[in-house]
Structure formats: C-alpha cells, structure tokens
Amino acid sequence: MQEQRAERLRIALIAGGTSGEREVSLTGADGVERILDKEKYLVSRYDSATDLPRLAADAASIDFAFILLHGLHGEDGTIQGFLDLLGIPYQGSGVLGSALAMDKDLAKEFYYNAELPVADWHTIAAGDFFYSEELIEDLGLPLVVKPACAGSSIGISLAHTEEELLAGINHARDCSAGAIMVEQFIKGRELTCAVLGNDDLQALPVLEIVPGDKYAFFDYEAKYQPGASEEICPALIADALREQVQDHAIRAHQALRLRGYSRTDFIYGEDGKLYLLETNTIPGMTETSILPQEAAATGMDFPSLLDTLIELGLEKSKGKKG
C-alpha cells in the first residue's frame, strides 16, 4: 500500500486568491479535489491569498499544480510565472497566453489581426477622460461596458442611454482599477466552445447559453444563480454555424498563443453574423460548468477530463512551449 501511494502524482491544488471570483474558485476546487482519482493523485490545497510561501517551501515535493484561480493574479499570468520560477508544471496556458487572454482589449486586437470577427469597441485607459457623446456617436446604443481585465462578467453592464453608459463606466471602475471597455451590444444567441490540446487541437461540441427572461445577457447572476439560465449541449444550430464556431475557437486559441485548453464565447447575431467575445484560459470547473458539459457530450466524464488536462500540462512542460 505504501508503494502504491509513493507512485501517486503529488498535486498542488491552487484556489481562492484575492479577486472578486474567490468564492467561485473555492467552489470549483472543492469539486475537483473530490473528483480527482485518489489512486492516481495525492492532493494538497493551497490558497494563493495566504499560502504562496508554503507552496514555495513545498516546491521540491510537488509534481504538478492544478490552478483553479480566476481573475486577477490567477488567469493573468501571475501565478503561472510564479510556478515557472519554482519549476512546477501546471495545466493550461503559460504567462504570455494567460496575460493576452486576460486583457480583453489586447485580445481583441489579436483576434482582429487574425481576421476573427469582433464587435466594434473603444477602450478607456485607467484614469483617462472620455466623452460619452463620442462613444455613442461612434458605437451606437445599446453598449456593453466592462472592465478590460476581469472575469465571470464582474463589473459588466448594458447601457441603453447616455445616463446608463456613465453609470456603467463608474460601476466598472468600482470593480477594477484598470482600463474599461465599451463595445457594441450584439443581440443574438450566446454560444461557447472549448478547445483541448497543445499542438493537436480538438474543438469540443458547441454549447448554447439561454439566459432567463430577466437577463439581457449572461451576467454574473445569470452564470451562478441556479436556474437563471439554460445550457444546451450540443447546441441546436446548423452544421455550418457549428463548424464556424469550432473553427473560430481553435483560431482564437492559436492567436492568443494558448496551451492545454481554453473556452471561447461568441454571439450569433440577429444579423446572421458570428461575433467572437472573449477567451477564458481557466474555465469554471464544477461538474455543471460549461467545459465539463462539453467534454461529457463527447463521452469524456469529469475524472477523465481532469486526467487529460494534467497530461496536457505535463506534456507542455516537457516541450517548454506557451
């Protein structure tokens, strides 16, 4: 029995943190810790808000880190760089890809350069003045307002009037000290598609998110309030649209130099055009989260998905890419 335990991969499960998505992170980590195969893995928990010195001290005895941090210092390359310094491999993208995807403004520039369709937008740098009349003149109404570097729809709002635009910008600034994005609101169907792999990429089945009647879009409450939205996987869409979404998800993954896995969100507009919204490098990881649902639609259960992410992370560390 002792020999069997010695062969188990020693996993540092990193969660918590200090961002506004702390509780989401901890909930996901509870599920992952429960689901990880105890015959394969020996799991230790670390909260990045308090346990980084302990993680550094334990580095020599850790085989792999599973990151379940969201938002600031989790998805932006910070923890990835720390683990690189410690020589601990981890799942998902490295410093560069994580930082690019976390900065929604910069990511949209990369999408645009890769000829991927995006809604028009303006970015207001932290502390900069802006003219609401010019934003409305250039982009029209309604407008989506959100922090450029936050996740889980934190700080996001929909503005139908100039007054709502000003309130939305102030709200976003309350939620983030960084830049604010103002972009055209595209009314349509919300679709999302995950990608698995390092070099050989696989797009998973497309999932459609149908927010409840009280939600104009998939905001924080619609994401995490039970019953607030319906998720349909595989999405009931035409084959041509499904192929386009999967193609664009892979191209977004490549454009941002991502590794291991990602999930890209889209809107299929009422104008019949597909628009890319953003890419998430550490998607939610509860059993009912989108990525596990998409994996399940291919026949991959949650434990197998976790195994795959760990295997891809170990493969990435050997190749020293991303």
Swiss-Prot record:
Keywords of this entry: ATP-binding, Cell shape, Cell wall biogenesis/degradation, Cytoplasm, Ligase, Magnesium, Manganese, Metal-binding, Nucleotide-binding, Peptidoglycan synthesis
Cofactor, free-text remark: Binds 2 magnesium or manganese ions per subunit.
Binding-site residues for Mg(2+) 1, renumbered to this chain: D265, E278
GO terms (BP aspect): cell wall organization; peptidoglycan biosynthetic process; regulation of cell shape
One Gene Ontology cellular component: cytoplasm
Pathway(s) of this molecule: Cell wall biogenesis; peptidoglycan biosynthesis
PROSITE patterns the record matches: ATP_GRASP, DALA_DALA_LIGASE_1, DALA_DALA_LIGASE_2
GO MF terms held by the record: ATP binding; D-alanine-D-alanine ligase activity; metal ion binding
NCBIfam families tied to this protein: D_ala_D_alaTIGR (TIGR01205), PRK01372.1 (NF002378)
Function: Cell wall formation.
UniProt record similarity statement: Belongs to the D-alanine--D-alanine ligase family.
Name used for this protein in its record: D-alanine--D-alanine ligase
Gene: ddl
